[in-house]
């Protein structure tokens, strides 16, 4: 251990009276290592450390000096959360597909393991992550603390909301110092009976052994019986494409109205491609441009310059993307349609 200050962030389930602490030094000599707080001193000899007997918390921190042969070498500041669950992500390949890899691009997808532990230390979920990727628009571009999307290998209720789903989001709340806004308004929306409102809860995130802060874990706005209850096109694609979404590559094309769309190559189209589709209006502007652009695997630009992400199905074939981009263009044309006097009519005979 070197340097003046070190911070240890513990989950709510950790026992401060039975903490296992290890101090590593760069010396081969026999050294006496001690922890000293405002209430006492304890030699580190392999026994558990009772933090509460060594120091009182001040401003939420237990401050312990590390003494090496009686000389102060560093200070450890210990903080502990209260009343929220802890979520542990462990990458399958932390060397090449760890957090740095995932944070570098929303196109980078990793796999791993997930452990969710409640405030009392009970495992809520312990299983595989079949997908782990960064998400967000402006927050992804500008914030160091990234948000993520995770996909479990089976449906599970991570936050005791009564709904089991595979796909969840971890919202960083980078632009909200209170970390309350998103949850507060979603809870309000649920109380008002608004449809398609995702359930949320706070968690502490530990990613490959590093504490990343408090996140909001949320159901993803997705197509399912407890979410947006429309025809699930992803299931239709999965039924006719083995390994759907694996090693997917994309290409660009134009629909019959001359608007660009992006699709996934090599897919067999389902027999019925009329829906449902879950769309997202994307307002993020691309570099060196004043115009937004879709930033998912499937997306299109409308005649009015709006950028639309297709959130479900995540990977769309060429015919499906042509269909939904043209359908939306006809909707947009109707919205902006005017008669000879400039009155909006809601009808466009040309489309």
PLM features per residue range, with description:
Residues 218:
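Gly/Thr-rich phosphate-binding loop signature of adenosyl cofactor/nucleotide-binding cores
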Residues 36, 69, 153, 208-209:
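Short strand-turn-strand beta-turns centered on an Asx-Gly dipeptide
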Residues 110-172, 316-320:
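Conserved oxyanion/phosphate-binding beta-strand-loop segments in alpha/beta enzyme cores
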Residues 223-351:
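ATP-dependent phospho-/nucleotidyl transfer catalytic cores
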Residues 5-8, 52-131:
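N-terminal module-boundary/linker segments of secreted carbohydrate-active enzymes
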Residues 1-62, 66-80:
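Predominantly extracytoplasmic/ectodomain segments of secreted and cell-surface proteins
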Residues 159-214, 314-350:
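A conserved hydrophobic secondary-structure block that centers on an alpha-helix together
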Residues 77-90, 95-103, 107-110, 127-128, ...:
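Extracytoplasmic/secretory soluble proteins
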